């Protein structure tokens, strides 16, 4: 239904609810520009945190913008409330109970929810995200050829051996914390996270990708991992910054808007 509080003179905001794996109900914000479509669409995947709210973008006046959530986040937490820290290892000892696998399934369902909505006719679709959101955006693009562009900032290395190194910052450090408590489960952790590795999925991505990394990032996308990921993505524009998990910060945000505008035909 429409949300009068967040709607603006140039766009309307809707609250969207849809069903994911295991019948889990999810929430998303959807904004639709005024005027006649079709409109290009941008899906901003959620990072690792409890709240994923509407975020300002100058493209909202010209594109449909979707802000989905995954299970455990605010407004998608009626059944399960995610813990931060803690979500990365919730149920990790068993393939069937590992919550992060369902988080990735939730990401895939966001594309279905977008294409199934009736508020606007859609043109080309881009996915974007930072941290976990960057990894989710890449994962969806690897499985959906109808995505036209991906802008991923410091995508989380979950599933890659780089995520299990000691001495990392959070949130990846949650994995090392877990293995210090349960050292005998290292092989189980490797096995149950392996197919979430962005590098494993990278070769399947057909869309162009704008990838940003920070040379001091040890909590989400370590530099060596990011560089290897860029090599595996068939069409990747890698930008390296002297930052950490924020990547290029405001500077890269401006580049990203210009890049997305070009890929979506917004001029």
Model-derived segments and their meaning:
Residues 86-131:
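Gly/Ser-rich "nucleophile elbow"/oxyanion-hole loop immediately N-terminal to the catalytic nucleophile
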Residues 215-221, 246-247:
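Acidic catalytic loop of the alpha/beta-hydrolase fold
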Residues 23-26, 32-41, 51, 60, ...:
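Proline/glycine-enriched tight loop/beta-turn segments at coil->beta junctions
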Residues 139-184, 248:
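Hydrolase active-site cap/lid region
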Residues 53, 57-105:
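Cap/lid segment of the alpha/beta-hydrolase catalytic domain
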Residues 1-36:
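N-terminal cap/lid segment of alpha/beta-hydrolase-fold proteins
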Residues 205, 211-213:
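Short beta-strand/loop motif that positions the catalytic acidic residue
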Residues 224-267:
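C-terminal catalytic histidine-bearing segment of alpha/beta-hydrolase fold enzymes
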């Amino acid at each position: 239904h429409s949300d009068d509080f967040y709607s603006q003179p140039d766009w309307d905001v809707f609250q969207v609810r849809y069903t994911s794996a295991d019948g889990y109900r999810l929430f998303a914000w959807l904004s639709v520009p005024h005027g006649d479509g079709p409109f290009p669409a941008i899906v901003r995947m959620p990072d690792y945190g409890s709240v994923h709210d509407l975020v300002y973008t100058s493209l909202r006046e010209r594109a449909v913008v979707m802000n989905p959530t995954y299970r455990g986040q605010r407004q998608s937490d009626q059944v399960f409330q995610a813990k931060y820290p803690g979500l990365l290892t919730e149920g990790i000892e068993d393939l069937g109970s590992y919550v992060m696998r369902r988080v990735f399934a939730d990401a895939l369902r966001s594309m279905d929810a977008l294409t199934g909505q009736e508020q606007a006719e859609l043109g080309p679709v881009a996915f974007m995200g930072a941290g976990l959101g960057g990894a989710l955006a890449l994962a969806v693009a690897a499985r959906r050829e109808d995505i036209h562009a991906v802008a991923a900032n410091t995508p989380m290395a979950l599933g890659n051996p780089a995520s299990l190194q000691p001495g990392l910052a959070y949130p990846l450090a949650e994995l090392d914390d877990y293995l210090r408590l349960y050292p005998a489960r290292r092989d189980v952790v490797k096995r149950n996270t392996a197919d979430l590795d962005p590098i494993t999925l990278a070769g399947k991505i057909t869309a162009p990708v704008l990838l940003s990394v920070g040379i001091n990032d040890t909590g989400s996308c370590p530099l060596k991992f990011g560089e290897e990921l860029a090599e595996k993505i068939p069409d990747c524009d890698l930008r390296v910054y002297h930052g950490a998990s924020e990547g290029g910060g405001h500077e890269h945000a401006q580049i990203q808007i210009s890049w997305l505008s070009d890929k979506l035909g917004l001029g």
